[in-house]
Regions:
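Alpha-solenoid ARM/HEAT helical repeat scaffolds used for protein-protein interactions
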Residues: 90-91
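Membrane-interface helix-boundary motifs at transmembrane edges
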Residues: 126-129, 189-195
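Alpha-helical transmembrane segments and immediately adjacent membrane-interfacial amphipathic helices
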Residues: 1-5, 14-40, 61-86, 96-121, ...
């Protein structure tokens, strides 16, 4: 509505695209929540030495639909980000919206790993390739978003749009927070892991980093209003990291 109804206002254009991106994340999270409805089967499956499919778990079709939906939402987010970035020459607001959408796409992609890990462990079909690849996917997405943010900050120094880089760094930290769930599921699946109790510290550390960046930006906001929005966004992202 904001994008179509206020096409001449750059603020509404940016806000509209960002809200739409958050909607895609909400759709991915709802898929993750749906896949967790039978989470209680995971401990029993993990204790089971065999790889026999648990009949109480999801069907193959349900598993594929859950993973497929998250993949679809992620592809939409990436395509959306690419289209916006391709229009950067039309105005800085397209660059800002496209960059943030790219960060949101990284989170959507990270949630694919979470949904796939949960769904497969519920069916007892989680294998060694899953144990290796899903955590890597989330860590790669977090690294991409974080480095993307650093590049924006350094490459656009002196430009108001460079403050978007701090938001990208925060979105990258959210990906790292998600990685804690995926890594924990992978590390304790059918094996013991001595540092399992330490993994939950990852969300705490990422949240503290977000809040530290937010505090820094609040100070900068006293000299430059361009830091007003990213400072508050990082506080919200810090809260998300705790979840």
């Amino acid at each position: 509505i904001w994008i179509c109804g206020f096409a001449e206002n750059s603020n509404f254009i940016v806000s509209g695209h960002v809200v739409a991106g958050v909607g895609l994340i909400a759709a991915c999270v709802s898929t993750a929540a749906t896949s967790s409805t039978k989470f209680y089967l995971i401990p029993a499956n993990s204790a089971n030495a065999t790889n026999e499919v648990n009949k109480e778990g999801f069907s193959v079709m349900t598993q594929n639909v859950l993973i497929g939906l998250t993949l679809l939402f992620s592809l939409i987010a990436w395509a959306w980000a690419i289209v916006l970035l391709s229009r950067s020459s039309e105005g800085a607001y397209f660059f800002v919206a496209g960059t943030v959408m790219g960060g949101l796409a990284c989170i959507c992609t990270s949630l694919i790993a979470l949904v796939a890990s949960i769904a497969k462990q519920i069916r007892n079909t989680y294998g060694e390739s899953d144990r290796k690849n899903w955590p890597k996917l989330v860590l790669v997405m977090g690294t991409v978003a974080f480095i993307w943010g650093l590049v924006v900050i350094l490459a656009m120094a002196g430009n108001v749009a460079n403050t978007t880089g701090f938001i990208m760094m925060g979105l990258g930290l959210v990906c790292f927070s998600i990685s804690s769930k995926v890594i924990l599921l992978a590390r304790v699946w059918k094996q013991s892991f001595a540092l399992a109790s330490r993994i939950p510290l990852i969300p705490v550390l990422t949240a503290l980093l977000c809040l530290f960046l937010a505090a820094f930006l609040f100070e900068e906001g006293g000299y430059d209003n361009a830091f007003f929005v990213p400072a508050r966004v990082l506080v919200g992202l810090g809260a998300i990291c705790f979840c």
